[in-house]
């Protein structure tokens, strides 16, 4: 089914590779990037403060993941870093540790600013930062849209060490001078591929203009399109590069399958047939539009299947409640869109269903990286209509993976 490139395939892997090569081969590139290959196989070998180590171990980390083994120390040294690793490999804890190691806790001023593309992801980073910094007494605040501006201003006025937020609200706080940039010495872009997409690029530039000229910059991402690398040149000073080649973006530990559903209308019955299997574990179902989230939720509930749903049109409070229920396990099947893929950090998720295939190969990683987090096993099931065959081919070529047809014994895989 996916053995040959359909004509007119939207994604051209050769073009991607040649653009990346062209960028990395430019005359000044060698001066711009330096590679960083030092590996620290234990958190104890990284020279971290005792109370930060306590927080790391209390959070449940035992051994650093590959990106943490290479990424924490250069950030702690104050170097500008570009780091690429798939979702679920511990990127967030990498930059949180680097920030927490360098803060001056006696100075209750904002010293680190972290930007994220969605409210959910910003709030997730805030939680990780607070947990890892529990024994250090770190003060963190998430500035995101859909919450009270006055409350943000009150908390910022009382003093924080770290602000995490979405670009719109952070820029608003800087513009109102509620967030003072004078002490900011670290600036992190998380999920930079999304952040630097056209929607956020201008806001990030505006924010960067307001920050002190001497600042450490960290760029973290699961995928690193050439455009993102190009933009980092404007922000960064001789960064070290910890970059996974595209063919090394393995989705290790995640078994991937497709179900040939032929037509769009047949997807619902296929999902209902799978529902008993889904409810064994925690599952996330991705569709491509907010309207479809509502439609599928209604259809599933109409057939007496318990599901919860979240998308960007819901108010923040409702989304928070739904995510809390899902994290606690009281709701087990969540229907959502790409927009929120990056804010779902639920350790128990072991099944992701792409009811709709993503419209871009890059988003596939963000979606299915929700399962099999930190080495746990995960399963991804892709519903594929005739119209989707081209995208399935593109995804396999982009990640250098083979996606097999779903076997009958799917329950045994979970």
Swiss-Prot record:
The keyword Hydrolase applies. ATP binds at residues 85-92. Gene3D superfamilies: P-loop containing nucleotide triphosphate hydrolases. It is an enzyme of class 3 (hydrolase). GO terms for cellular component: cytoplasmic stress granule. It catalyses: ATP + H2O = ADP + phosphate + H(+). GO terms for molecular function: ATP binding; ATP hydrolysis activity; RNA binding; RNA helicase activity; translation initiation factor activity. InterPro entries: DEAD/DEAH_box_helicase_dom, Helicase_ATP-bd, Helicase_C-like, P-loop_NTPase, RNA-helicase_DEAD-box_CS, RNA_helicase_DEAD_Q_motif. Residues 253-414 form the Helicase C-terminal domain. Transmembrane segments: none annotated. A motif (Q motif) lies at residues 41-69. CDD domains: DEADc_EIF4A, SF2_C_DEAD. It holds the Pfam family Helicase_C. Its EC number is 3.6.4.13. A motif (DEAD box) lies at residues 190-193. GO terms for biological process: cytoplasmic translational initiation. Residues 72-242 form the Helicase ATP-binding domain. Keywords: ATP-binding, Helicase, Hydrolase, Initiation factor, Nucleotide-binding, Protein biosynthesis, RNA-binding. eIF4F is a multi-subunit complex, the composition of which varies with external and internal environmental conditions. It is composed of at least EIF4A, EIF4E and EIF4G. ATP-dependent RNA helicase which is a subunit of the eIF4F complex involved in cap recognition and is required for mRNA binding to ribosome. In the current model of translation initiation, eIF4A unwinds RNA secondary structures in the 5'-UTR of mRNAs which is necessary to allow efficient binding of the small ribosomal subunit, and subsequent scanning for the initiator codon. Belongs to the DEAD box helicase family. eIF4A subfamily. This is Eukaryotic initiation factor 4A-1. The lineage of its organism: Eukaryota, Viridiplantae, Streptophyta, Embryophyta, Tracheophyta.
């Amino acid at each position: 089914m996916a053995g040959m490139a359909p004509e007119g395939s939207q994604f051209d892997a050769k073009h991607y590779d040649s653009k990346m090569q062209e960028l990395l081969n430019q005359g000044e590139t060698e001066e711009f990037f330096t590679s960083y290959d030092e590996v620290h196989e234990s958190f104890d070998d990284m020279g971290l403060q005792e109370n930060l180590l306590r927080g790391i171990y209390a959070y449940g980390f035992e051994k650093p993941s590959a990106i943490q083994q290479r990424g924490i120390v250069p950030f702690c040294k104050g170097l500008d870093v570009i780091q690429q690793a798939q979702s679920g490999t511990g990127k967030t804890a990498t930059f949180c540790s680097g920030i927490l190691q360098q803060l001056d806790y006696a100075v209750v001023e904002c010293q680190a600013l972290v930007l994220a593309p969605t409210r959910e992801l910003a709030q997730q980073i805030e939680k990780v930062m607070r947990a890892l910094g529990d024994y250090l007494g770190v003060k963190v605040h998430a500035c995101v849209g859909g919450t009270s501006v006055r409350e943000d201003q009150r908390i910022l006025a009382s003093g924080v060490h770290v602000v995490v937020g979405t670009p719109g609200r952070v820029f608003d706080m800087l513009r109102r001078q509620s967030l003072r940039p004078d002490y900011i010495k670290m600036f992190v872009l998380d999920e930079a591929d999304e952040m630097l997409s056209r929607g956020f690029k201008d806001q990030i530039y505006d924010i960067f203009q307001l920050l002190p000229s001497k600042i450490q910059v960290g760029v973290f991402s699961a995928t690193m399109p050439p455009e993102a690398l190009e933009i980092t040149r404007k922000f960064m000073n001789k960064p070290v590069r910890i970059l996974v080649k595209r063919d090394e973006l393995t989705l290790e530990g995640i078994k991937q399958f497709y179900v040939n559903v032929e037509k769009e209308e047949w997807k619902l019955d296929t999902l209902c047939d799978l529902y008993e299997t889904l409810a064994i574990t925690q599952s996330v179902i991705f569709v491509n539009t907010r309207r479809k989230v509502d439609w599928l939720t209604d259809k599933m509930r109409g057939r007496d299947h318990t599901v919860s749903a979240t998308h960007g049109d819901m108010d923040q409070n409702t989304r928070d409640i739904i995510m809390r229920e899902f994290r606690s396990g009281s709701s087990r099947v969540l229907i959502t869109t790409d927009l929120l893929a990056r804010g779902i950090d639920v350790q128990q998720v072991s099944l992701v269903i792409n009811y709709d295939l993503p419209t871009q190969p890059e988003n596939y990683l963000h979606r299915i990286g929700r399962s099999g987090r930190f080495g746990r096993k995960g399963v991804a099931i892709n519903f594929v209509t005739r119209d989707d065959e081209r995208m399935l081919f593109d995804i396999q070529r982009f990640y250098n993976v083979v996606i097999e047809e779903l076997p009958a014994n799917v329950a045994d895989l979970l």
